[in-house]
Amino acid sequence: IDIKFLEDEIKLINSLNVKGIACLGLGTEVNKLSFKEKVKIIELISKYKSKNTYLTITISGEKYTDQLKLIKVANANKADWLVLQPPAKKKLNDRECLDFFNSIIKNVSNNTFVGVQNAPEYLKSSLSPNSILKLYKNYKTFRYIKGEGTAKILAPIIKSYPKDLKVFNGRAGLEIIESLKIGCEGIMPSVEFSDKLNEIY
């Protein structure tokens, strides 16, 4: 990875006065990184981000133990929010997916908010709205969802959630206005045009 480029990118994001920085969430790219590279990216962002900017780290890994290793690194770097992804290669049914996330969330610090990336259109495994609500009821720290869908798809799902279960849309900022209108708390866009998306927000 290009350390200098990443440092410059973080400083650029700081200059935009955004609310937070998220990393390791682009599945097509993050799965090409080694564990050491993931750790380095987390450390760089933790070091260079603005003091009052939230740090969100996506946790991926095929095995329970892989994700726990990365969670320890995230906790050591004072992540505010962890976004858990289901395994990328293996397709899990709703029950298996819920069990997987249950086993992970039990081991997350009580000082760290946690959510899941729920993207049925993009990931092999996802949770039903009912399973999302089970996690919400079981864990006081489970208060966020990173959705990946059109505003039309997300609208009825958001309506079924409690008001303090916040949904952020992804998809690089597509449909930002529509996403905000249906009740998304915000979006998690790509960096390239975050300045314009921040103005729209």
Segment roles from a protein language model:
Residues 105, 109-112, 119-201:
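Catalytic alpha/beta core domains of metabolic enzymes, predominantly
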